[in-house]
A protein has these predicted regions:
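ATP-binding N-terminal substructure of ATP-dependent carboxylate-amine bond-forming enzymes
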Residues: 1-106
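A conserved helix-loop-beta module that forms one wall/lid of the active-site cleft
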Residues: 97-125
């Protein structure tokens, strides 16, 4: 069985419990999950092996990334899955500074994807 350590951000979101259970039950893998959120009472806290409170990503990007890097080292993280839009943007913007795999798109593409007007412009024929 392959072991993998995953860091999931914004585990206080509505879909977090289902997503975390799905990761945990992935056949062929022994998965340890580190969950983060800016709030102590995040619902996903109950579904992770370790829980850490992080600063809000959009509030102080550099501090947020510094804390992400600390957790990657502390828990030997193999993969980061950012679950909040703001976390996704910040992590994608600084992904070259983070020493593990990250499940996120290109920063410039995400900026377009999160703006309905820009998506419409990009898709116009």
């Amino acid at each position: 069985m392959k072991k993998i350590n995953i860091l999931v951000t914004t585990v206080g979101g509505v879909t977090s419990p289902d997503i975390l259970k799905a990761y945990r039950n992935t056949p062929g893998y022994e998965i340890k999950i580190v969950g983060t959120d800016a709030f102590e009472f995040a619902v996903g806290k109950m579904f992770v092996d370790h829980f850490e409170i992080l600063p809000i990503s959009k509030g102080n990007e550099k501090l947020f990334i510094k804390e992400i890097k600390r957790l990657v080292k502390k828990y030997s993280i193999d993969l980061i899955i950012p679950c909040g839009n703001d976390d996704n943007l910040v992590i994608s913007r600084y992904k070259d500074l983070i020493p593990c795999k990250i499940m996120t798109g290109n920063y410039k593409d995400l900026l377009i994807a999160y703006d309905k007007g820009k998506v419409y412009e990009e898709l116009e024929f």
